[in-house]
Each structure stands twice: as C-alpha cells, then as structure tokens.
Amino acid sequence: MKKMDYQNVRGTQDYLPEQEVTRRAIRRTLEDTFMAYGCKPLETPILNYTELMASKYAGGAEILQEMYTLTDRGERDLALRYDLTIPFAKVVAMNPAISMPFKRYEIGKVFRDGPIKAGRFREFTQCDVDIVGVASQAAEAELMMMAIDAFDKLNLQINIQYNNRKLLVGLLQLFEVEQEQMNRVILILDKMEKIDQKTMLTELQELGISSNSINKIKQFLEERTQINMAYFNEYANENMLLQQGLQELMELTAYLNTLELSEQCIFNPFLARGLEIYTGTIYEIFLADEIIRSSIGSGGRYDQAIGGLLGSEQSYATVGISFGLDVIYTALELSGKIERNTPIADIYIIPIGTEKAALKLAAELRRKEYKVEVELSGKKVKKAMEKANRENTQKVIVLGEDEVTHNMYKIKEMQSGKEELVAFEF
C-alpha cells in the first residue's frame, strides 16, 4: 500500500494547542472590542456561487485570479470565499427587513491562491466589521477608532493611513487618464511601496497611457514630500469628483482631530487600494514598529456593492474594516509578546486507583467554575506531576483511596507548595 502524504497543503497549517490558545485569546479580544462598539455577530457560508464572488462589485481581477473554484455534483459553479465583504453584502441584499444602520462583525476563514509570506497564507482567518446605513464620515472615524482600541488591547501600536478614492480618481481624470484604464493605473500606483518610480512609469507606458498623462503622474509623484490636503485645493474647482473626495477627507480629518487620533491616523494621498469596489474613503493599517512592513488590515467605503448585487441603481452607504488574525499572531510572535505555557486547567487531579471518585470531584469543582483536568491514562504520580509542572498548572490534587475513605482531599498550590485539606463527600 502506498504511504499517504501527511504534509499540509502549501499555504495551510495546523495550530497546535499552545498556538491556538493565543489565537483564541486574540479572537476574544477582537470580539469584545467589536461588541463594545455595538456590532452584532454574523456568520456566512464559506462556499458561494462563483457568479457572486466574481461579480464586478467583488474583489477585482487581481483577487479573482486567486479564487479557489470548483464544480459540485449538480455541475454548479462554486467558489470558496476570498473575503467576508461580498458574502456580507449578499446578506444585506437578501434581507431587506434588516434595521438600519446595521453594524456587523464576522470572524471566519477565507481562501486565496496567492503568494505566501510572513503572516500570509492561502487559508487564513479574517476579522471584519462593516456598517451599512451611515453616509457621513462618522462611520469611518468610528471604525478607525475601534481599530486603534483593538490593537491597543492586543499590545500592538498601529498607524492608519487614509485617502479617498474620489480624490485619486478625480486627480487622474485631470491628468487625462482614460476611464477604461483608470483602475489599472490605480493598481500600478497601489504598488508604490513595492516598486521604484522608474518601474512604475514603465508599467504605465506598457499600459498605453499617454506621455502627457505619464508626465503629470510623474510630477505628482516627485512632489510627494510636499503634498498635504491643502495641495488639492487648487484642483477642487476643476473636477467635481476630486472636490467631493476632498470634502469627505476634511470631514473625516475633523472627526479624527476631535477624537485626538490625528497622530495615529495619517493622510496619505498616494494610498490607492486597487479594488474597484471602493467608492470613497480607503485606509490601511500598519504596525508602528514596522516589524511587519506590509499592511495588517485595511478597508474603506463601498456604497455601490449592495445595490449592484440587487441589480438596482440604489446606493447603500456602506463602510468596512478588516484585520487578518494570522498576521496579528505573527506580529505578536515577532514582538515577543506571546505568553508561552499558558495553563489550560486550574486544577489537575491525579487519581491513584480512584478514577470514579476523581471524576465526581472534578464535576463538583467544575460546577464552581474551575477548569479541571483528570489524569485518566494511569500515569505514575511522578510523571503526572512532571506534566503539571510542564503545563504550568496552578493546583494539583493527588487522590488516593485513603482520601476517599476519609471524605477529604489535599490540594497543593504548585508555585508556593502550600497545601490545604478540604472536606468532600465522596
């Protein structure tokens, strides 16, 4: 018989208990923060129709190339979700009775057949919050504040860079970039931190962008150190879309100043976020210490997606933010901020021929909300105590027949060595 290949699929991994304890603690911290902001939990299917995930309101051509697709026995074209945004938009589209504004969070696995790097896998856990029904920049400000709160609780300091898609598109319109080339140009600009300016300009030439437009883009890039929000005032009267984007940015900045978040939330006029789904504010989250240089979270406003899925022109004011749980874990690990050997059980009971009595005692202790493990494999006391020390268990009970006969047990605090005799009716 051929030996089975026990390796994990490339881009996937197992999380052993020591890792999973930390991952679940991260998840609880995020969930507690999300709920503190009034967000409601939601769960959506991993498996979706390809048509939904590939719609023009979905992830764009670059992500669609990474989509896992399959055909079921009914020959239906299906896909594994690559994010939580489109499944959420589908839920809102299918449930018109949902009360607005609707704030939801979802933490779940998503799949992308993309490149693998630190904290980036092909099966990974995404943590999303989205708000439907708030047109003002108050929604963006609250999500950015929530992100800072969440990462503070995780002992990670972050910066959030933000921009506005309308500002960027309006500027490119003034640079005479053709509408059908717009998103491909934005995708190239989105790679600014990864490629040099010469390579970027070459890619624009290969795309067929006119030399006039390229020269204007080049000048814009060369002035990057001098560009702030006021820079765009002179263009505001020349392009309505740019004007709207600038107004939204000023509104958001006013909120951030009031919330005293302006030091951590930084306007970046070159932030592009190449996904076509975005219609307004966009932002990306970075670690302040740059222990991971790529973004660890992102989001933005996508007012057309829900209406688009419904096949209507109606706009649904929607904005979201997303964090990767796996990259958060990697950041904590690289920063040395993960507590190792966290005990699972509060009390470890070692029976010496008294398994039935040990299970009865454990049941009573659990009713008192202790986490209790009973040694059931027949380990000798010495080996069992070594396990208790190795797993950093706080308290141990060695339960022999004499203790059961006398209706008492001795509980030992492992750190101090202190022992206490406790009566119990076996």
Predicted regions and their residues:
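Polyanion/phosphate-binding surface patch
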Residues: 46-78
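Auxiliary tRNA-acceptor-end handling modules of aminoacyl-tRNA synthetases
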Residues: 1-20
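Acidic, His- and aromatic-enriched active-site or binding-groove loops in soluble protein domains
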Residues: 63-72, 177-199, 287
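Short, conserved phosphate-binding/catalytic loop or strand-edge motifs used
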Residues: 121-127, 162-170
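Acidic carboxylate-rich catalytic motifs and surrounding loops in phosphoryl-/glycosyl-chemistry enzymes
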Residues: 45-46, 161-166, 268
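Positively charged, Gly/Ser-enriched RNA/tRNA-binding surfaces
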Residues: 22-37, 48-49, 65, 75, ...
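Hydrophobic mid-domain F-helix/FG-region of cytochrome P450s
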Residues: 148-153, 167-176
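Generic N-terminal leader/targeting and pre-domain segments
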Residues: 3, 28-38, 43, 58
